[in-house]
């Protein structure tokens, strides 16, 4: 819908690919499941030739994503998108990753899009100011709120669960956001990608792979107004 609106109004589309792309590639006969994540990034960067350069980072978990991202994709893509797990911990890991591979994180973009409202976005922006370029995708709060009421915003999500007769999955870094209708396949993909949620990783586990990581959580820098 947003691509259509950009075309209709003559605006430049800004964004990234969706979880559905990672899911669809799992169902392709010519793509091994273990290569689905890399293949998506390869094909996307080839198709758009540098445009729309924000990589979605959580379909198989952010830890697994960083294993596949590497120096090549880190240079090709403008930045990465957060959509699950603690947003501050994710940002600290992303900055530490860029530092590790010799890229100045201030030249890259962190794009947050998970359950945002204006106050949370401002808190994230303040925390990462001058450390990485900050961008936000605010959908539900801005696009599905009934104006002039206190009704809870509508949350409408569609994901791919089967392709060519094969189950597919979205793991994510948050409890409750996994999307798969086949438990056996879901467990298989977790093993293939050595999955572990960033929220469940210990500080020592993270520092072992990202030595400059700073252990900060959203709750350390932000308290919701209603709390």
Regions found by a protein language model. Name each.
Residues 1-93, 98, 123, 128, ...:
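Buried, small/hydrophobic-residue-enriched core segments of structured protein domains
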Residues 62, 76, 85-108, 113-227:
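Gly/Ser/Thr/Ala-enriched C-terminal appendages of enzymes
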């Amino acid at each position: 819908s947003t691509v259509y609106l950009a075309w209709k109004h003559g605006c430049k589309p800004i964004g990234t690919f969706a979880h559905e792309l990672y899911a669809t590639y799992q169902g392709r006969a010519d793509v091994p499941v273990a290569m689905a994540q890399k293949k998506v990034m390869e094909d996307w960067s080839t198709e758009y030739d540098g445009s729309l350069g924000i990589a979605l980072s959580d379909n198989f978990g952010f830890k697994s994503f960083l294993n596949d991202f590497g120096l090549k994709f880190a240079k090709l893509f403008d930045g990465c998108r957060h959509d699950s797990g603690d947003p501050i911990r994710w940002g600290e890991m992303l900055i530490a990753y860029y530092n590790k591979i010799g890229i100045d994180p201030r030249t890259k973009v962190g794009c947050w899009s998970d359950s945002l409202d204006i106050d949370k976005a401002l808190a994230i922006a303040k925390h990462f100011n001058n450390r990485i370029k900050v961008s936000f995708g605010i959908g539900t709060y801005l696009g599905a709120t009934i104006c002039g009421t206190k009704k809870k915003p509508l949350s409408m999500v569609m994901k791919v669960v089967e392709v060519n007769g094969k189950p597919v999955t979205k793991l994510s870094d948050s409890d409750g956001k996994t999307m798969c209708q086949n438990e056996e396949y879901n467990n298989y993909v977790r093993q293939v990608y050595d999955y572990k949620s960033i929220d469940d990783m210990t500080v020592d586990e993270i520092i072992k792979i990202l030595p400059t990581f700073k252990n900060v959580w959203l709750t350390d820098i932000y308290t919701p107004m209603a709390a």
